Design a protein with these regions (language model features):
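Beta-strand-rich interaction surfaces with strong enrichment in secreted/lumenal proteins
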Residues: 58-59, 138-140, 273-278
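Acidic/His-leaning functional-site neighborhoods
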Residues: 100-101, 204-278
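Active-site/ligand-binding surface loops and adjacent short beta/alpha elements
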Residues: 160-162, 166-240
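Beta-strand-rich N-terminal accessory domains
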Residues: 1-67, 218-238, 245, 280-292
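Extended, loop-rich substrate-binding clefts of extracytoplasmic carbohydrate-active enzymes
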Residues: 88-143
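Beta-strand/loop-rich accessory regions of lumenal/periplasmic or secreted enzymes
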Residues: 61-96, 182-188, 197
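Asparagine-centered strand-capping/turn motif at beta-strand->loop junctions
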Residues: 30, 151-157, 292
Length: 292
């Protein structure tokens, strides 16, 4: 499929194969494992996404940075709604199983203006052993001077499917102390660091301590850093804001002690009460747009 491509080739980084794209309008990288977009930088601009300098391209483990796909559950299984938990065999696996599985390239189209890539994965013996649903999952990347991602779930089983999910986007900043997020004002959120209490955001979000919150409402945010303003829009009604801060940074894999100062996450999600109930043979699409 890529034999005649002018802009895209497959490269191997340590143990993982990646699509490496060098287009006149942008450069990008997508790992075959997890269909994880790790880099996207329009020509003449700074990177849209943060990738850990300590990221490890290893089979069977998540990669720290870019946009990991969390599916069919977000976070730890035990913190998901009962409908999601009862459908899944008990596991310590966080963020589901598709982020560490190889996806296939289903479609590739390129032009002088943009590149469209569709990657996909379906149920297998390995997935059915964990999660008893037949499914098809595809991720459409539309890459140009902005970034669009669409994660489409189709329920191929005969019964209702419950799942949570997230496009776990990492964003860069040169100084977390001089970074704020607009768009969450007056939204309710669940504070995972304070006994999962529900609170209300009054002002813009400033990150000056560990933050792990799920916000509910319209997903339309602006990240203001010393360098630029980044717009993050999604059709979901739940978004996760995360920064590990000082102590947790020391415990995270593929993450240096000071990395919290140069990143933050806004994760477009369907989490907690926003989890998805999908009837048999129906589809659901989670959409994300990132621009400046």
């Amino acid at each position: 499929m890529l034999d005649k491509s002018v802009f895209c080739k497959i490269v191997t980084k340590d143990q993982l194969d990646c699509l490496q794209i060098n287009h006149p309008k942008f450069m990008a990288e997508i790992c075959i494992q997890g269909a994880q977009l790790t880099q996207f930088t329009p020509t003449g601009e700074q990177a849209y996404l943060w990738l850990s300098p300590d990221a490890e391209y290893q089979k069977g483990q998540g990669l720290r940075g870019g946009i990991p796909i969390c599916w069919p559950w977000f976070g730890g299984l035990s913190m998901n709604p009962d409908q999601v938990k009862t459908q899944t065999k008990p596991t310590e696996l966080a963020h589901g199983f598709v982020r560490t599985m190889d996806w296939s390239i289903r479609e590739y189209r390129e032009s002088a203006h943009e590149i469209n890539i569709v990657m996909g994965i379906s149920h297998s013996e390995a997935s059915l052993a964990i999660w008893p649903f037949e499914f098809d999952l595809s991720c459409h990347f539309k890459l140009s001077n902005t970034l669009n991602v669409e994660l489409k779930t189709t329920n191929l089983s005969s019964s209702n499917m419950y799942f949570s999910q997230a496009l776990h986007s990492y964003f860069p900043t040169s100084d977390i102390h001089n970074t704020k997020i607009l768009g969450a004002e007056k939204q309710n959120y669940v504070d995972a660091l304070d006994l999962w209490k529900t609170k209300q955001q009054v002002e813009s979000i400033a990150i000056n301590k560990e933050v792990d919150r799920i916000y509910f409402g319209k997903s339309d945010y602006r990240i203001l850093t010393p360098e630029h303003a980044t717009c993050v829009k999604s059709n979901s009604l739940s978004s996760v804001i995360w920064n590990p801060w000082i102590n947790k940074s020391k415990r995270l894999s593929q993450f240096s002690d000071n990395a919290y100062q140069s990143m933050l996450c806004i994760e477009s999600a369907n989490a907690l009460e926003d989890a998805v109930s999908l009837p048999s043979l129906k589809s659901h699409t989670l959409k994300l747009n990132i621009s400046r």
